[in-house]
A protein has these predicted regions:
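N-terminal "leader" segments that precede or initiate the main folded domain
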Residues: 1-7
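N-terminal ordered "arm"
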Residues: 7-66
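Catalytic micro-motifs at enzyme active sites that drive phosphoryl/nucleotidyl and oxygen chemistry
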Residues: 32-37, 45-50, 67-75, 90-96, ...
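Short, structured segments at the rim of ligand-binding sites
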Residues: 39, 76, 421
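A surface-exposed, charged beta-strand/loop segment in the N-terminal or early-internal portion
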Residues: 60-138
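Extended, acidic-biased charged interface segments
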Residues: 118-172
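Hydrophobic, aromatic-lined core segments that form the binding pocket/scaffold
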Residues: 149-404, 417
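Acidic, carboxylate-rich catalytic segments that either coordinate divalent cations
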Residues: 391-436
Length: 436
């Protein structure tokens, strides 16, 4: 497996003495070079002594030497400066386009490294590297967690940047879409994003002093004021409900005025959803947040602490929704505020990523730092991923930790991408007597 040979070379997970070219010259690897992930030789600017002479240049690596010709390197001038060709099997001499014959060295993946790598790929245990975790140094774990946390924010920044583009460059609109998406709390996330992109905020702004009109705007665009969206057993009661009919009438007026097109209500999911998370309630909460002018990016940027963010995003519902979860069915009265846990999730999944993305966009380090500060202030999330890492011995204390470990599982463990993981490196390095 060529990828594994690359890895062994890059990290020097092979005996560093007794190395020789196929024609018997001693080889000393001083610097394996810079790994190239684009077109051209695999490693740039390597430093290798061959027969006592120091060479600085490129190194190419293959499973078999004949892959050189299979990949047509003999016709590519980019390979003229290869100072060493490394392969696990040397079955032919190789030649550059210039007519030179680069020295070749056979490099075998140490048996223990190969066995441990195959174990990582094939084991049913999860995570595959669980045995080594208790022995990892705190410094190594902290360093890797910090990198993963940043990587996760960078990944979310890409999604936010795309939303900004979709919103014609408006960061305010992109923030509203991100906030709304995370009001879906996973199950309805896609539906909420679709809905939020159908909300013309400039048009809504003309009616922001009228909460009922905002609810009509928001619920109408969600398709939830369509009678067909109401379960049949509640339809007649809803049609006799003065608040529902008033909202429906108001939305029809707004739809005509602004040329609105509602989304298909079938996109909303209700199965196995707690009533508190029904889209009606979440949209009612967002309506109130918008009405009180607490759903804007400018207000968020003024918050310098988690406490201030909680106060900003704390929301409630109108009297009608205190006794309803859907139209047409009355329920016991409850305030239906956003819970502390839900607020924390909004800070983790909306606030921190938006601050980080906006800070990078504006080259304003204070917002990026604030994003990290908020994640380090909040306690770790409680979910099956966090519990798994705790069970194998990792300390998970802050939201920054839990976000890092979610990134680790989704982007490395689930993809079996152990060769890019620092824990995977420790696992493979520990399987060899070589300390790279």
């Amino acid at each position: 497996m060529e990828q594994l040979i690359h890895y062994v070379w890059k990290h020097k997970l092979f005996p560093l003495t007794g190395l020789k070219t196929t024609d018997g010259q001693e080889v000393e690897v001083i610097d394996t070079g810079l790994h190239n992930h684009n077109a051209g030789p695999d490693f740039f600017n390597a430093k290798v002594k061959i027969g006592g002479t120091l060479w600085v240049g490129n190194v190419e690596i293959h499973d078999r030497a004949s892959d050189w010709f299979l990949h047509r390197h003999d016709r590519d001038p980019n390979y003229n400066n290869v100072i060493l060709h490394v392969a696990e099997s040397i079955d032919v001499d190789v030649k550059t386009r210039r007519g030179d014959y680069p020295p070749q060295m056979r490099l075998q993946v140490p048996t223990a490294v190969r066995e441990h790598y195959e174990e990582l790929l094939t084991t049913d245990e999860y995570p595959a590297c669980y045995r080594i975790i208790p022995s990892l140094s705190k410094l190594m774990v902290h360093s890797w967690m910090s990198a993963l946390q940043t990587e996760r924010l960078e990944q979310k920044t890409e999604a936010i940047a795309q939303r900004v583009k979709d919103c014609d460059g408006s960061w305010e609109a992109a923030y509203f879409v991100t906030l709304a998406r995370n009001y879906g709390f996973g199950i309805n996330g896609d539906a909420f994003e679709t809905w939020a992109k159908l909300i013309p905020l400039q048009s809504v702004a003309h009616h922001r002093d009228n909460l009922m009109q905002i609810e009509a705007f928001f619920l109408g665009q969600a398709g939830l004021l369509d009678t067909a969206a109401i379960p049949e057993r509640y339809q007649q009661q809803a049609l006799n409900d003065s608040y529902f009919t008033e909202l429906k009438s108001e939305y029809q007026y707004l739809a005509h005025k602004f040329g609105l097109q509602a989304m298909d209500a079938n996109q909303w999911r209700f199965l196995r959803l707690r009533p508190q998370n029904f889209p009606h309630i979440r949209i009612a909460q967002l309506s109130h947040l918008y009405y009180e002018q607490r759903a804007g990016l400018s207000q968020l940027l003024e918050c310098e602490s988690v406490k201030q963010v909680r106060e900003l995003l704390a929301t409630q519902v109108t009297h009608y929704w205190e006794t309803h979860y859907v139209f047409g069915e009355e329920s016991a009265k409850s305030e239906k505020k956003l819970s502390a846990a839900s607020l924390n999730l909004q800070i983790i999944n909306t606030v921190a990523p938006i601050l980080f993305a906006y800070g990078k966009h504006k080259n304003a380090e204070k917002y990026c730092e604030r994003a990290f500060d908020f994640l380090e202030t909040l306690k770790a999330e409680e979910n099956h991923i966090v519990r798994m890492w705790k069970e194998v011995g990792l300390m998970v204390e802050t939201a920054g930790d839990s976000q890092a470990l979610i990134q680790l599982k989704k982007e490395y463990c689930d993809r079996k991408d152990c060769l890019r993981c620092r824990i995977g490196y420790e696992y493979l390095k520990g399987s060899s007597s070589i300390k790279g």
